[in-house]
Amino acid sequence: RLILALDGDGDRFIGSYNSYKIDGEILCYLLINLYNDKFKNGIVSTPLTNRKIVQAITKEGIPYYESKVGDSNVFDLMIKKHCKFGFEASGHLLFSSYSDGILSSLIFLSLLEKDENKIKKLLKDLKLNHFKQLNYSLKNTDEFIFNITHSDIYKSLISYIKPGGRILFRKSGTEDLCRIILESRSKKAIKKVQKEIEKYIEDKRCVE
């Protein structure tokens, strides 16, 4: 079963194929496995990309570059690094100088036509890390990020969530929010880290 959908202005897509979610990073993963030679100049994405996808890219010998979050930042780094392809996990696929959800959808359909059995196997074999984004409205996001990333609790949580995990704090570029990314091989680790971060926020009275 195949479902494809676009966002309001048509520059992002998301889909479902045989119950597998298809988004920007999954489509990139499929492309590098079927058209490895097309990405010799490298691929650009953002810190929101699952580390398993990053590993898959570099394993293929493809240079990987990371920009700040936002399609304009991805574009800028693509130009700087002479890359013809970039993506965001949210569904943006960026081709040289534009992003087009319809084209992204057609590319996925062309991959199915080329080798549907291989697509099925690639999707079945892919084991992404568990990933969660938390959003908080805080009194002072910059101060919070500085304080927690220089705290003993942060060092402890980093040690706990590794290997293969990470904690990323960033200030939203579109809303007055602190966004926290938790990624780990273990759901249990993500739950524990989230609980400890929320306790820190409560203890330090960071919430507005």
Show where each model-derived region lies.
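Phosphate-binding and adjacent anionic-ligand microenvironments
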Residues: 38-208
